[in-house]
Design a protein with these regions (language model features):
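Short acidic/glycine-enriched loop/turn segments that link adjacent beta-strands
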Residues: 95-98
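Metal-dependent nuclease catalytic core centered on acidic motifs
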Residues: 4-90, 114-178
Length: 178
């Protein structure tokens, strides 16, 4: 590779076509470091996670907040490994109706980890898409059980918005198309 001083990057790359990887990496590196932490970059897929410093501070409030942060960060990394650009947002002191967890490629979204059965999926989707101001919801599902797919389809029909999901063991993010 080239050993180009950072101050010369724009001059060197000017007029050259950027690969998607270079564009993603430039976006990842260009965030305001006073506001965002560069948390994760997936070299294989060019996805990334940047986290608001306020969100990291919130995770120190309690053991439960730390566990919630770690679960949500794990979900963000799965999205990044599937090629998505994730902004992981702080949760406290946000306007009512604007309490989604992340943006995924600029789309306001909430993260929902389903640990039991499929019974709460529609309720989770409604909360994310209506009460929390999301345009999408990302579900982590524990298995490929048909009941989960049926509930996701019902949620998509009833709630609108976009629904992404992945199976915990597979970690391949898919969007539900209805």
């Amino acid at each position: 590779g080239y050993n180009i001083p950072k101050s010369q990057h724009n001059i060197f790359f000017q007029g050259r076509e950027y690969s998607p990887g270079i564009l993603a990496f430039k976006e990842y590196k260009s965030v305001d470091k006073a506001v965002w932490e560069q948390s994760y970059f997936s070299n294989g897929s060019n996805g990334f996670v940047v986290t608001e410093h306020k969100r990291i501070l919130e995770s120190h409030a309690s053991k439960n907040e730390r566990a919630k942060f770690e679960k949500e960060m794990r979900m963000c990394k799965v999205c990044a490994d599937n090629g998505y650009r994730i902004n992981f947002l702080h949760g406290e002191n946000r306007p009512k109706g604007q309490t989604y967890d992340i943006t995924i490629n600029g789309l306001k979204a909430d993260l929902k980890c389903v640990s039991g059965g499929a019974g709460n999926i529609v309720k989770y989707a409604k909360k994310a898409l209506v009460k929390q101001g999301g345009e999408a919801v990302v579900f982590e599902l524990p298995s490929r059980s048909p009941e989960f797919y049926e509930s996701l389809t019902k949620a998509r029909r009833e709630c609108g918005g976009r629904i992404f999901f992945y199976i915990e063991d597979e970690m391949i993010l898919k969007e539900l198309k209805v």
